[in-house]
Each structure stands twice: as C-alpha cells, then as structure tokens.
Amino acid sequence: MKRILAFVLVVVFVFALSGCGAKEAKKDIFNLVEKNYDAIVTACENKDSEALLAINGIKEVDIVDGYVLIYCKGAGIAPSSQDYGFYYSEENLPVGVFDGQIVCSNSELVDYENGYRYLDSGYNEFYTEHIKGNIYFYSTAF
C-alpha cells in the first residue's frame, strides 16, 4: 500500500512540475502565436499546412470552411482530457473547435472569462479566446 501511495505521489509531483495545466498550455500557445505571428498569418492566408507544421509546437493542422484549425497539445485520457490549440478565422469570428472540426458557431457561444464558451449536451466544454488579429486560442475538455 505504501508503494502505491508513493508511486501516486511521484506521478502527481512530476505532472505538477511538467506544466500540464490549462493556464500553462494557454500561456505557451499565446507565446507561440506572438513569436511566430507573421509566419502563422501568411501560412493561414495561403492555407499552407506544411509551413504551419514546420513551426515548433504545432502538431496538426486542419482546414475547414474558412478556418485553419491548429492543434498544439493535449493532456489526460477520456473522459477527463483536454486539447489545446489555436485557429485562424477568415471572417474573424470565434467558434468551438474539437478534433479538427468546428462543433459550434459563433452564435452558440456565450461570454465566459476572457472569451467564449460552449457546453454541449454530453458535458463537453469548448472555450475560445481572441489572441491577436484573426487568431483565437481554443481549449476543449471532454
């Protein structure tokens, strides 16, 4: 029993030090966008997923209906997982994003903290916040 407790405490400690939290992920993504803003905007305007994937910190790119959806990181195992990234909106409108798809429109979002939130009927939460220009941060909890 003591070994199991010690193992659990070590795992919790390692995750605490690794910056796996939502605030750290958000800060990292805001910094990534700020540092690479011109390259990101140019690549998004040209729908150049290869140029985006060449930027350190970008893992996946999906282009859907005037949006370039960019996945950066995730944590956890469903049903307690979170994904983080950002997206470029041609019309500069926020939306809900999940798994490379748009899950809700601008009109379905409600004001929340510094951005907007959408809760679906399955208790999944989608949050988005303006970063700069036509670029928005997103997080998804599912």
Identify the meaning behind each predicted range.
Residues 3, 18-25, 136:
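A contiguous, well-structured "functional interface" segment within a domain
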Residues 1-2, 20, 36, 48, ...:
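Serine/threonine-rich low-complexity intrinsically disordered regions
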Residues 3-8, 28, 119, 123-126:
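Short, flexible coil/linker segments at or flanking structured domains
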Residues 1-18:
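Sec-dependent bacterial lipoprotein signal peptides
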Residues 1, 37-40, 86, 140:
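Aromatic-enriched hydrophobic runs in primary sequence
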Residues 63-142:
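Extracytoplasmic electrostatic interaction patches
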Residues 20-78:
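N-terminal export/targeting and maturation segments
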